[in-house]
Amino acid sequence: VEWTDAEKSTISAVWGKVNIDEIGPLALARVLIVYPWTQRYFGSFGNVSTPAAIMGNPKVAAHGKVVCGALDKAVKNMGNILATYKSLSETHANKLFVDPDNFRVLADVLTIVIAAKFGASFTPEIQATWQKFMKVVVAAMGSRYF
C-alpha cells in the first residue's frame, strides 16, 4: 500500500489523540456485546454473560489495551504493516483459531468508538483515511490464514 504524506499525517494525528487505556477496553467490550458469538474466544476471561459483566471485566479491559498496543505498532510501521503482523496473524490463525472476519468487526467497532469520542472532528475525510488504514491492518491480520 502506498501512503500519501497526508494519509500518514492523518493516521498519526488520529492515533495520537487516542487514549489506549480508554478506547481499547471500550472497543473490545463493544465487540463482545454487539457480536456475542465473539465471546467464544474469551472463555478464560471469566464472566462475559451480560453487557454489565463485560464492561466491568478487567480481563476484557486489559486485552482491549493489548489490541490497541498492537495497533500502535501498525501506526509506527505503516510502510510494512504486513511484516509487522506476520507473527500475530500466525498466532490467531494457527493457535487461537480466530475467524478472520472478526478482525473486520473489531476494526469497524474501533472506528465507531473513535468517531463517538472525537465527534465532529472525525470528519468523513478523516474517516476515509482511517478506514483505509484499518483495511490494511485487517488484511495483514488475515494474511497467515490458509
UniProtKB/Swiss-Prot annotation:
UniProt note on tissues of expression: Red blood cells.
Pfam family, one: Globin
Domain of life: Eukaryota
Keywords from the named record: Heme, Iron, Metal-binding, Oxygen transport, Transport
GO biological process: hydrogen peroxide catabolic process
Residue span(s) of domain Globin: 2-146
SUPFAM superfamilies: Globin-like (SSF46458)
Claim: Transport is one of the keywords in the record: yes
Recorded GO MF terms: haptoglobin binding; heme binding; metal ion binding; organic acid binding; oxygen binding; oxygen carrier activity; peroxidase activity
Sequence positions that bind heme b: H63, H92
GO cellular component assignments: blood microparticle; haptoglobin-hemoglobin complex; hemoglobin complex
Quaternary structure (record): Heterotetramer of two alpha chains and two beta chains.
Record-stated family: Belongs to the globin family.
Additional facts recorded: This hemoglobin differs from other fish hemoglobins in lacking a residue between 121 and 122.
Listed name of the protein: Hemoglobin subunit beta-1
Organism lineage: Eukaryota, Metazoa, Chordata, Craniata, Vertebrata
